[in-house]
């Protein structure tokens, strides 16, 4: 009888202090983040950006140069950031992880275009890449002919030779000297020519060119004057 009363008291005490059992919490366990291994494909570096064109080196895949320089490509020498990057095949979780963190409006789009660099995405869709179309960096289309014209160096303009001018007195003295030597400078007359050039103030080459250019005109003029004198 005493045992039963003790059990009842214990039951009353337990009933006053105890609280209703809390339901077990559902622990959400997330899978360990999967490491995303990226592959770097062809090199997209524009080697003709300075001239306004678009020329790539043709490197098809990034290969580390050495352990000391792992970010330099052994094939083309460019930095790894110039190569097109995408996750390795079979890593569907990486694409899924990217879609979970993007808004719904962006998730509705095709994921491959989001994973590609702007230059690669533009080349796949056939769109002009900004910065290569127009000189101001717009989105204008660039034809092959315009690219060739930009890459083709402009022809070098020949330097125009300055024309030597003579005074009236110099022309008269050169005419008299040319008639005296027969409009031709002989080798044995080099000393005479040098003395005349120093006296008149002209260069030897300028005197020679003047005699060559005016030889026929002065001869024709002299012949006409002789004919007129004979007719009179």
UniProtKB/Swiss-Prot annotation:
Any one GO biological process: regulation of developmental process
Record remark on domains: The homeodomain differs form the typical one by having namely 4 instead of 3 extra amino acids inserted in the loop between helix 1 and helix 2.
Gene this protein is translated from: ZHD5
Compositionally skewed regions (Acidic residues) per UniProt: 1-11
Subunit structure: Homo- and heterodimer with other ZFHD proteins.
Recorded GO CC terms: nucleus
PANTHER family registered for this protein in UniProt: ZINC-FINGER HOMEODOMAIN PROTEIN 2 (PTHR31948), ZINC-FINGER HOMEODOMAIN PROTEIN 5 (PTHR31948:SF95)
Role summary: Putative transcription factor.
Top-rank taxon, per record: Eukaryota
Protein's name according to its UniProt entry: Zinc-finger homeodomain protein 5
Site feature location: Required for DNA-binding: 211
Cellular localisation: Nucleus
Record-annotated DNA-binding residue ranges: 159-222
Keywords for the protein's UniProt record, in alphabetical order: DNA-binding, Homeobox, Metal-binding, Nucleus, Transcription, Transcription regulation, Zinc, Zinc-finger
Alphabetized GO MF terms: DNA-binding transcription factor activity; transcription cis-regulatory region binding; zinc ion binding
ZnF (ZF-HD dimerization-type) ranges: 40-86
Region (Disordered): 1-25, 126-170
């Amino acid at each position: 009888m005493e045992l039963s009363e003790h059990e009842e008291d214990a039951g009353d005490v337990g009933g006053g202090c105890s609280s209703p059992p809390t339901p077990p919490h559902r622990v959400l366990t997330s899978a360990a983040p999967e490491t995303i291994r990226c592959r770097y494909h062809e090199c997209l570096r524009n080697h003709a950006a300075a001239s306004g064109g678009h020329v790539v080196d043709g490197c098809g895949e990034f290969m580390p140069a050495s352990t000391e320089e792992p970010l330099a490509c052994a094939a083309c020498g460019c930095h790894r950031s110039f190569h097109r990057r995408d996750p390795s095949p079979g890593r569907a979780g990486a694409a899924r992880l990217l879609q979970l963190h993007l808004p719904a409006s962006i998730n509705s789009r095709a994921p491959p275009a989001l994973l590609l660099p702007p230059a690669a995405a533009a080349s796949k869709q056939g769109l002009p890449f900004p910065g290569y179309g127009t000189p101001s960096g717009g989105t204008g289309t660039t034809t092959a002919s315009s690219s060739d014209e930009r890459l083709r160096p402009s022809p070098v303009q020949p330097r125009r030779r300055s024309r030597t001018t003579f005074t009236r007195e110099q022309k008269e003295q050169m005419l008299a000297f040319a008639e005296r030597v027969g409009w031709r400078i002989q080798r044995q007359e080099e000393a005479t020519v040098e003395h005349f050039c120093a006296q008149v103030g002209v260069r030897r080459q300028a005197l020679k060119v003047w005699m060559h250019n005016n030889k026929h005109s002065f001869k024709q003029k002299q012949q006409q004057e002789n004919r007129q004198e004979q007719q009179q």
